[in-house]
Amino acid sequence: MPRVIHFEIHAQAPERAVKFYRDLFGWEFTKWPGPQDYWLIKTGPDGQPGINGGLIQRRGAGPTGELPVIGYVCTIDVPALDDYVKKALTGGGTLAVPKMAIPSVGWLAYCKDTEGNIFGMMQADPKAA
């Protein structure tokens, strides 16, 4: 069956978004040498489960608070959800959905990045209730 192999973040201010995600998750960004502003994103070591992605200049207006999510929301596995939510807020992000328990799975929260994009963060915890 087909699998997701790549994700893409659209940004009004790409440099600001690169800094946000680099500081928050330690992701590596490499400017693509092609004709458009595009950054390749490496989210972890080769051989570790997960996918890599890209970041591109947004074409058109950014999302507003009144719009529902249009597109897919990526959720990032983190070791300490509370710490990462604090890092996201300190880095210029905002809280979209507060921390909640997913029983027997873990803890989940949703944030918005500096560009208004929503992303999830989850801490595995089989005792979450």
Residue spans for each PLM region:
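N-terminal beta-strand motif that seeds the catalytic metal site of vicinal oxygen chelate
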Residues: 1-19, 71-76, 123-129
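Core segments of cupin and vicinal oxygen chelate
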Residues: 2, 8-50, 90
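Vicinal oxygen chelate
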Residues: 9, 30, 85-129
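Short alpha-helical
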Residues: 15-16, 82-83, 106
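Conserved short beta-strand elements that form part of the metal-binding/catalytic scaffold
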Residues: 28-68, 118-123
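Conserved hydrophobic/aromatic beta-strand scaffold that supports enzyme active sites
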Residues: 38-40, 75, 108-110
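Mid-chain, well-packed structural core segment of small domains
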Residues: 63-93
